[in-house]
Amino acid sequence: MSDKLVVWMDCEMTGLRLDSDKLIEVSALVTDSDLNILGDGVDIVIHADDAALAAMPPVVAEMHARSGLTDEVRRSTVTVAEAEQQVLDYIRQYVPTPRTVPLAGNSIATDRAFIARDMPALDAHLHYRMIDVSSIKELCRRWYPRIYFGQPEKGLTHRALADIKESIRELEYYRRTAFVAPPGPSTAEIAAVAAQLGGTAQTAESPQVEGTTQAD
């Protein structure tokens, strides 16, 4: 798996019911390992019929009406298949080889479930590993509450592209506040921690090869 790039995605749906709700907006950005955004990304509003929009739970209907997404969905002529192709075209500019780059975002498993359901070719192009910023948030809530409560406020626009950019900014915040500063601990310090936890540290000279037996 590549350690240089990350694919970021966010989706807006008519709800969270995987058996019935519709995917109505999808956005994607690719970053390098330092979270610099590559290119302009894509942001695509997908058409849904009035029946699907009428079935939205009240809180979702109010959210999408306030953001303007509902009106854009009605005006859109883009199908799910067309949106999938546009996202793939953008991602393949930077990630031509399938299953080499992880998917990132906030609570990204929810987005991934709708992507897998509606956009199987896109799902297959992404590595199965995911980077969930929400997991780091929850760890900071428990281990570093000052970091958790000091995080920058979110815009809460509930539009896909804006949400991705906020997720990238949030991860950069945690990187600067919660993670060990580069280049990280020394080899001896790493070995000591590994020994305390009952394991053996991998050496920098012998990286684990993708597909071997190490648990992941």
From Swiss-Prot:
Q: Which residues form the Exonuclease domain?
A: 6-171
| Parts forming coiled coils | none
Q: Provide the leader sequence positions.
A: none
Look up keyword Kinase and say if it applies.
no
Q: What is the lineage of its organism?
A: Bacteria, Bacillati, Actinomycetota, Actinomycetes, Mycobacteriales
Tell whether Hydrolase is among the UniProt keywords.
yes
> Could you tell me which species this protein originates from?
Nocardia farcinica (strain IFM 10152)
Looking at the Swiss-Prot or TrEMBL record, what is one Pfam family this protein matches?
RNase_T
Q: Which UniProt keywords apply?
A: Cytoplasm, Exonuclease, Hydrolase, Nuclease
Q: Please give the name of this protein.
A: Oligoribonuclease
* EC code: 3.1.15.-
Instruction: Give the protein family.
Output: Belongs to the oligoribonuclease family.
Which residue positions are annotated as catalytic? 128
Q: Which PANTHER family match?
A: OLIGORIBONUCLEASE, MITOCHONDRIAL (PTHR11046:SF0)
- Stored Gene3D superfamilies: Ribonuclease H-like superfamily/Ribonuclease H
